[in-house]
Amino acid sequence: MSHTTDNGRYELLVDRSFVAQHYLTVPDPDPPEGTVHSHRFTVEVLLAGDSLGEYNYLVNINDLVALLDDLEQRYRDAVLNDLPEFEGENPSVERFARVISDRVHDGLSTDRLDSLTVRVWEDDLARASYETDI
């Protein structure tokens, strides 16, 4: 059966897990949030668009995997507070999602993408996401 119209949307999702540290810079944080502590972060990058390219890719998955490999190397075992992208900022899980989103957006060809969503889990209970239209 052939479809003459297609109102569907393609999505591509890749994730990564790594341990990184941070401390929150808010007034009177609950322990241990005000001191350096570790989280096993899981980062999920979801790309979406309504058309595929020449090879039926939304984006080349190898490019996205390589970009996430680079991000994992940057953040694995790092204290987020010490990195320039968090200078003067509270390194909340929400902020971390935005930082990763900006880096993914800058590192990929986005000509076929409509949206980019980054979800970051800091543990089994808490996650934040940042979604942007492209």
Feature locations, PLM:
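Charge-rich, low-complexity N-terminal segments
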Residues: M1-I134
